[in-house]
């Protein structure tokens, strides 16, 4: 190989080397753009997920707050129910002939009015009495204490020993009830 040919080859090699870095640089920049686009998409998804999670957390906290407000009187209401029960028992214990006595009549009327006012106040705060007598036994609302022979269908509440109450949609106290059972002379039909 002559010296001229060597110079020519060296020039070609030098020229091809100078072209390769540009091509390599272009390939790297294309890969870099793709990487950045992929990272951008991932960050967008992460941002959307974070926003959705924050919104769900906000909704859950608002619901918990409203429930806390609605049910904040639960303990106090249970205590007041025992007062209402005692007033009912006191009135029930007074014989009818004494209720008619002029000296006691106004006292009895005052106790009855106080009991009604107490129940009205409880109702204003979402506390309602559970209707039991004549209803089918519902274990979510009633606590069966005894079975009583009755002509009513089996499982029907025939006696209420203690009233049950709900606060909004939750049970505050179950009603203690007596439930009908078939009379001893009757046979069960299958």
Swiss-Prot record:
Question: Main localisation, per the record?
Answer: cytoplasm
SUPFAM superfamilies given for it? Coiled-coil domain of nucleotide exchange factor GrpE (SSF58014), Head domain of nucleotide exchange factor GrpE (SSF51064)
Tell me how this protein assembles. Homodimer.
The record ties this protein, via InterPro entries, to: GrpE, GrpE_coiled_coil, GrpE_head
Q: Where is this region: Disordered?
A: 1-39
Q: What is this protein called?
A: Protein GrpE
Protein role: Participates actively in the response to hyperosmotic and heat shock by preventing the aggregation of stress-denatured proteins, in association with DnaK and GrpE. It is the nucleotide exchange factor for DnaK and may function as a thermosensor. Unfolded proteins bind initially to DnaJ; upon interaction with the DnaJ-bound protein, DnaK hydrolyzes its bound ATP, resulting in the formation of a stable complex. GrpE releases ADP from DnaK; ATP binding to DnaK triggers the release of the substrate protein, thus completing the reaction cycle.
Q: Does the keyword Cytoplasm apply?
A: yes
List the HAMAP family hit by this protein, alphabetically: GrpE
State one molecular function term (GO). protein-folding chaperone binding
Q: Say which family it is in.
A: Belongs to the GrpE family.
Record's subcellular location: Cytoplasm
A UniProt-annotated Pfam family: GrpE
């Amino acid at each position: 190989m002559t010296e001229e040919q060597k110079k020519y080859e060296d020039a070609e090699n030098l020229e091809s080397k100078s072209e390769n870095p540009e091509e390599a640089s272009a390939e790297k920049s294309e890969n870099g753009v793709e990487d950045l686009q992929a990272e951008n998409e991932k960050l967008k998804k992460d941002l959307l997920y974070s926003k959705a999670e924050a919104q769900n957390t906000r909704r859950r906290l608002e619901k918990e707050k409203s429930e806390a407000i609605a049910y904040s009187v639960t303990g106090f209401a249970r205590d007041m129910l025992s007062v209402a029960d005692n007033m009912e028992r006191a009135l029930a214990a007074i014989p009818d002939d004494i209720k008619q006595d002029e000296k006691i009549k106004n006292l009895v009327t005052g106790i009855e009015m106080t009991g009604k006012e107490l129940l009205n106040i409880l109702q204003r705060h979402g506390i309602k009495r559970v209707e039991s007598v004549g209803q089918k036994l519902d274990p979510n609302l009633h606590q069966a204490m005894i079975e009583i022979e009755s002509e009513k269908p089996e499982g029907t509440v025939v006696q209420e020993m203690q009233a049950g109450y709900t606060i909004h949609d939750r049970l505050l106290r179950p009603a203690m009830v007596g439930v009908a059972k078939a009379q001893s002379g009757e046979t069960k039909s299958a």
